[in-house]
Amino acid sequence: CFPSAGVYGTLVGFFCGFPMGALTAYTMYEEKQITQKEAEYLCAFTNNMGPVYFCSYVLPTLGITNKLPYLAVMYGIPLLYGLFLRKTAYQSCAFQKLPSGSRVSLLNAIDASIQQAIASITKLGGYLILLQTLYILPELFIRLLGHFPLVIRLPLPFLQAFLCCLLEITGGIAKMSAYPPLYVLALLPLGGLSFILQAGSILKNAGLSLPVYLLHKLIQTALIFAFYVVIIHAGF
């Protein structure tokens, strides 16, 4: 069983993948297991891409075989960032222990996570389809740029693939597979417009601030990008 809602929210957020981190924090806040401040804290560092998807699809698509260093950076940085926030901006978060009678058992937690995941996957699919249909916009933009002589020398195919990644990162990863992996790896913590819209809808329901969430994500993106630069230059 989980001794506190904070432990449960952290584990689900890290292992079940986006958007389960934000959704779990919202659900626990709605059920009054945590405060609004504690929900904001959990969303700041747990709402990440799932490790199974990261290892089984993202890294192989980018041609990366030595997965351990990338896995350590992708999830180690948010975890350390969460610990840092816990000692600084979110010191007031108590995460009271759950009474014995209300503690969440592992089986019940798994069952609840599966139910939430089914609803999340349906919503995720809707955003995925919607934003992938907008892939035509980067293509039209690049074609428009191609009519201007001064931008002919720009890497237009790369720019188009990168813009697609910004729109919807799941489909954009495949389009970026021919380019250095650093560009995609740098976008993963933020997740592109699709992830931001989903997170925004959840945060709005909880009365949480999307700009605050994005600020935390941008800080982690910068840190992860810096560590990936070191790893890639080290030959991993």
Pin down the residues of each PLM region:
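Transmembrane helical segments that form the transport core of multi-pass membrane transport proteins
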Residues: 114-188, 192
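Alpha-helical transmembrane segments of multi-pass membrane proteins
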Residues: 8, 115, 119, 123, ...
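Short, amphipathic, aromatic/basic-enriched membrane-interface segments that mark the entry/exit
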Residues: 37-45, 99-103, 158
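Alpha-helical membrane segments and immediately flanking helix-loop junctions
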Residues: 2-62, 163-177, 182-206
